[in-house]
Amino acid sequence: MSKAHKPWPYRRRSQFSSRKYLKKEMNSFQQQPPPFGTVPPQMMFPPNWQGAEKDAAFLAKDFNFLTLNNQPPPGNRSQPRAMGPENNLYSQYEQKVRPCIDLIDSLRALGVEQDLALPAIAVIGDQSSGKSSVLEALSGVALPRGSGIVTRCPLVLKLKKQPCEAWAGRISYRNTELELQDPGQVEKEIHKAQNVMAGNGRGISHELISLEITSPEVPDLTIIDLPGITRVAVDNQPRDIGLQIKALIKKYIQRQQTINLVVVPCNVDIATTEALSMAHEVDPEGDRTIGILTKPDLMDRGTEKSVMNVVRNLTYPLKKGYMIVKCRGQQEITNRLSLAEATKKEITFFQTHPYFRVLLEEGSATVPRLAERLTTELIMHIQKSLPLLEGQIRESHQKATEELRRCGADIPSQEADKMFFLIEKIKMFNQDIEKLVEGEEVVRENETRLYNKIREDFKNWVGILATNTQKVKNIIHEEVEKYEKQYRGKELLGFVNYKTFEIIVHQYIQQLVEPALSMLQKAMEIIQQAFINVAKKHFGEFFNLNQTVQSTIEDIKVKHTAKAENMIQLQFRMEQMVFCQDQIYSVVLKKVREEIFNPLGTPSQNMKLNSHFPSNESSVSSFTEIGIHLNAYFLETSKRLANQIPFIIQYFMLRENGDSLQKAMMQILQEKNRYSWLLQEQSETATKRRILKERIYRLTQARHALCQFSSKEIH
């Protein structure tokens, strides 16, 4: 028989038998004799699990009395019993199993599920699929029943087995917590809780109701019951109630930490079941889905083999397989058949059924066996999820702590404390401004330091100067021809009129003023934005203080931009005075001459002058000479301006601007009567800080719980 067509119990055994850690933990129990109980002998341990091939995934045969026996222990349950073999075995069971479930329940009680997903079992099913009956059989209490949507809020059902204690219950929702003394109170209190959470109509809510039951007759298990899937809105239900319910169900079942328990009646076509379809959508491989078949007594005669194929995992394969149960029917509920009697009738039904009794022997049938299976699945799932959960809690804690740090500390209530608080805020702001000015600010991976942003504009400025020099070279012949025709006086042929040289220099120096002022404007905007970003970082949560600082930044920017602009204008006015030190100019002039003329003394192609030469020889001589001088002078002028203009911008817009801003910030401290106004915090910031503190508290408690659990496991 191929692996794909093996009966499910055999596939299950081979799948789980490799889990050495569970087998190791259970070894201490497997050698003890089975306790006396009311469970039929064939249910104490399925024949095909005997010997060395026993299924390590289940809790060993000696645990069966803990989960399968729904009869109350002999004697008064409220009185402690002597520590016999049964109690000793339960004590060992308690040490291994209960802490796992208690750990997750405690994390859920802390509200950790608001921050990350916890291991859980979620029960889903279509309306009238028998979902409520299964949960009633597991919990031993009556849950809300009726037509339409009965479960209107997610219900966390925490079952705790305590052999020596009387029944006790507790229901919690929102700010309400109520102790229950009798199982009969459960249905009424759940109805009341749902009306509080979802209103008195037929709407639904995503808020959780927690129901904790402690009893000797329940398994150790925590299950989340979700609303039944509906397709048509009735009465006063919202028109999109079906979509709302599906969205709520999907919110839970899509989590990788959730085992999906899909309840399907035997008398429907499994391929058309909405619940199984939703589970398949979020778990295509069936790794975390268990199918539960209900109502085997209502199926049509002749369809038994098809149900057998489903349970044996041959029709719609799931890696965790299927189980089949028979719960109380409506008539039995009306006749007040107890859950204990219902369990006996269920066992008798499967024992005497010609087709299904083999499923009983294989451990795939009855509610008690389902309880054992679910407890084991949940424990395995918790143990598997703990390393990932620990990492997620640590990461979420770090992230929340960092967010809280960015929100800043709480604002003091005392005026004296407010002064120190404001001093510290301004001190940190000034330090960051100083780092910007010095080019030492801390940047993230994809960010750029302020100096590098400005430097890009400075590089463009060098390009502008080079372009301007080239323009001079290109128009020399036009200027010389104009001189020859209009302005030449008594000077001899070949002599250059110095006035012509000055006119050309003045003309092209003036063309550089606008690009220089444009560069100043761009640099100013970059620097101002950097200062504003620092202000938002430190004062963003204080609207009045942030506005005050940004207004100060704007005022100082205007002041120093005007100073820088005046200095640039002054620089260019000075450049109108044609000047260069003789020793510097002579060196540059010599270098240009060497580049212009080759050793034979003929014009070189480097200046590309040939195409611009006038026809007469005097023009050639004048053109070449003035070209050499202009080229030499503009080379030296470009060097001077390439550094001088950036110097002016850096000095006024960074150094002076930053210093003035830091001094102005200290002036704010003199206005003591404005402290409270300046430190008025935005309401969303206070809310965010409170939420983050609550999250950090939850996650801290969760880490503490995990550490305690780990230390107990080690010891």
Curated annotation (Swiss-Prot):
Residues 125-132 are annotated as: G1 motif. Residues 115-387 form the Dynamin-type G domain. It comes from the Eukaryota. GTP binds at residues 125-132, 225-229, 294-297. One of its GO terms (cellular component) is nuclear pore. Keywords: Antiviral defense, Cytoplasm, GTP-binding, Immunity, Innate immunity, mRNA transport, Nuclear pore complex, Nucleotide-binding, Nucleus, Protein transport, Translocation, Transport. Belongs to the TRAFAC class dynamin-like GTPase superfamily. Dynamin/Fzo/YdjA family. This is Interferon-induced GTP-binding protein Mx2. It comes from Homo sapiens (Human). The gene is MX2.
